[in-house]
Amino acid sequence: MLFFSFFKTLVDQEVVVELKNDIEIKGTLQSVDQFLNLKLDNISCTDEKKYPHLGSVRNIFIRGSTVRYVYLNKNMVDTNLLQDATRREVMTERK
């Protein structure tokens, strides 16, 4: 649940999602669920010449299992808080 909690803190932030089929989609994260499915608004494809059919799409739902990577702005992540949360989760799993 750590990643779910982490991504919920990124709602209304701009992210770039790289899919397993090499498509990169930039947009505003609107929601995330426990399966790490993502809903993005105001999207744009980073390579619109290669994927022209995405040019007219503004909102998209991305299944979590198709995501390869999510690019974040460095200042969007509090690394100390993330490290502490990771340690707490490991400690609760050991009990």
Swiss-Prot record:
Belongs to the snRNP Sm proteins family. It holds the Pfam family LSM. PANTHER family: SNRNP CORE PROTEIN FAMILY MEMBER, U6 SNRNA-ASSOCIATED SM-LIKE PROTEIN LSM2. The keyword DNA damage does not apply. Changing residue 37 to A: Strongly reduces affinity for poly-U RNA ends. It is found in: Nucleus, Nucleolus; Cytoplasm. CDD domains: LSm2. Component of LSm protein complexes, which are involved in RNA processing and may function in a chaperone-like manner. Component of the cytoplasmic LSM1-LSM7 complex which is involved in mRNA degradation by activating the decapping step. Together with PAT1, the LSM1-LSM7 complex binds to osmotic stress-activated mRNAs to attenuate the osmotic stress response, probably by limiting ribosome access to the mRNA and consequently translation. Component of the nuclear LSM2-LSM8 complex, which is involved in spliceosome assembly. This is LSM complex subunit LSM2. Component of the heptameric LSM1-LSM7 complex that forms a seven-membered ring structure with a donut shape. The LSm subunits are arranged in the order LSM1, LSM2, LSM3, LSM6, LSM5, LSM7 and LSM4. Except for LSM1, where a C-terminal helix crosses the ring structure to form additional interactions with LSM3 and LSM6, each subunit interacts only with its two neighboring subunits. The LSM1-LSM7 complex interacts with PAT1; within the complex PAT1 has direct interactions with LSM2 and LSM3. The LSM1-LSM7 complex interacts with XRN1. Its main location: nucleus. GO terms for cellular component: catalytic step 2 spliceosome; cytoplasm; Lsm1-7-Pat1 complex; nucleolus; nucleus; P-body; precatalytic spliceosome; sno(s)RNA-containing ribonucleoprotein complex. GO terms for biological process: deadenylation-dependent decapping of nuclear-transcribed mRNA; mRNA splicing, via spliceosome; rRNA processing; tRNA processing. Disulfide bonds: none annotated. Keywords: Cytoplasm, mRNA processing, mRNA splicing, Nucleus, Ribonucleoprotein, RNA-binding, rRNA processing, Spliceosome, tRNA processing. The keyword Cytoplasm applies. Changing residue 20 to A/E: Inviable. Decreases binding affinity for U6 snRNA. Present with 2210 molecules/cell in log phase SD medium. Residues 2-76 form the Sm domain. One of its GO terms (molecular function) is RNA binding.
